[in-house]
């Protein structure tokens, strides 16, 4: 008899096969960078980053790009950076469609230009003196603000998300992450990460 079963991660085998067949085993992801004008004088008006789907444009690789630009003689960018996301078609779904939890890293949507998996990594530490929770960040883009309203309370470390909520709002180019709820006061610290729904905050 035939029995229907959940494919789980086995579904990735089909997409991987299609990628190997279409792109070939030697395909390498890349990102192109264009300057608005010559950088012989050490300055340019702007840089354009054109993405081609590289999923591993990590912060370490971004620093490598910065060093390479400096080695080319670039010292200043007058009008900032522009990004080109046109290589991929616009997403027809939202990151929260799967389980209504859009900031979870596994819900990150495909993007032609994606830096550091669009993640923000941080550590939560209880502050018994103020009955609040301190947040320290590994890397936080300047256009992202955390509104920390957490308080100390009862709970268990592995299940701290049961009593803490992260919500994202965007106004112009600034994203605010509101953090509310009760953090387990018996936890010495918790390391956590979120993936922002907008993909341009590292540029």
Each model region followed by its residue ranges:
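Short active-site loop at a secondary-structure junction
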Residues: 2-18, 22, 26
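Conserved serine DD-peptidase/penicillin-binding transpeptidase domain
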Residues: 22-203
